[in-house]
Structure formats: structure tokens, C-alpha cells
Amino acid sequence: MPKITIITVCFNAEKYIEQTIKSVTEQKGCDVEYIVIDGASTDSTQQIIQKYESGITKWVSEPDKGIADAMNKGVALATGDYLMFLNADDYFQTPDAIAMVVSQMKDDRDIYIFDTIFLKKEGGLRRHSGTFGKRINFKGLCHQGVLCKRELFQKVGSFDASFKICMDYDFFMRAYRHGATGNHVDEVLSVMRDGGISSRQDWPSLKQRFAEEKRVHLENNTSAFMKIIYTVYWTVYLPYRKMRFAFK
């Protein structure tokens, strides 16, 4: 049975961190290592972590340089065969979620992709599916539904801390470029709340996310044809989204 490392990064996350932690510590029928990386929270986050300390393998609380830096700290501490990130606004849908994941690991892929439920602020749910193939050139993956082999980080490198939003998309694109193998499983693994940095809908946040996505596209493709496709795509798409935002 493969050992699964679950990493939670958080900062001032007292509102939801308890649900996240409980959803991990209540997993059954599997070998789980749980690592929590707190960015020196000033609210009650650390006290909540301490409350569940017996179910947490390792945790640290210290200042970091952003989400990517915190995620890299988690990777450095991990000893599992596969790693996944379940951050402070996310939680597993069921107590046997990881047991379900392990039951699907039959073909030794580098990456396993499961579905994620997106919980909207205004109410309602949306199911997000992803695939690891050519489609990733235009559509990223929800890291809350993805497990990666630990050795993949040794081959591909860590998360690029110069990204504030799209560090996971950049990592998956680099993994694809390095020939990593992936498999999509049509099962829901986790729930992701609206409100994280990647789901903000104000124009400055959208503009930053689009700028980072464009950078991911252009830096992770050596094909002249794809660079032309991306240049045309962003020349059209960015003004379209700006106009759409203006008329909301």
C-alpha cells in the first residue's frame, strides 16, 4: 500500500482550518502522513492545530515568502510515495477518500487526477474534472484533486516562488514537458471553497492570474507554433475578459 503525504499550508485560517484538519485525521484504511505548514498565523490557527496535534505527523509555524514557499517546505518534509495538497479552505468529502485513491493506483502513474467539488460563496456546487495530456496546455488542474509521486518533484523541481497564484499550474506544465504520466479517475476526492486567491474575481486579482497563466504558457512551450497560438489567444482573450468584467 503506498504511503500518502497530505500537506496543508495555511495562514490566519481559523475559520475553516479545523474542518480541513478533521477531514484528514478521520481518514481510515490507509497509510497517511499529515504535514501542516503555518505561516506564523496571528489568529487562533496555531491553537486549532495544537488541538489536533496527535493526528498530525509534523507541523511548523514560521514566516514564509508566500504560498509556493510554504508548499515547498511541505514537500521537503514529506516521506510519502505520493503527495497532495489540501489547504485551509479545502476538505475531503468522505472519511474513506484516501482509501478510494489508493484503490485506484493500479498502473504506477506519476500523477493521479480526481474530481473536485467547487463550493460557491453564493451557494451551489460545480464539479471540476481535469486531464493530464495536451489539454493541460489550456486548462489547469485543481491541486486539491491531484496526487503526485514524491520523486516527480526531484525530477521536475519545486514550485516556483515567483508565482503568487499559478505555481501549481506551472509545476504541472513542467511535469508534462518532462514526460510525466498521468491518469484521470472519475471520482470526487475533495471539496474546494470559493474565496481562495485563485478564485478571486476582482479585476486586479484576475489581471494578475491571467498574467501568470500567460507566463506559464509561454515559458513551458518551446514549439514556435504553440507560442504563436498563445500569443494570439492572449491578445484576444485578455481584452475580452476586461470588457466582460466592466459590464458585470
Predicted regions and their residues:
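Nucleotide-sugar donor-binding/catalytic module of glycosyltransferases
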Residues: 1-202
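Short, surface-exposed amphipathic charged segments that create phosphate/polyanion-binding patches used
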Residues: 73, 246-247
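Catalytic core of nucleotide-sugar-dependent glycosyltransferases
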Residues: 192, 201-226
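A transmembrane-helix-recognition feature enriched in membrane-embedded lipid enzymes
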Residues: 220-246
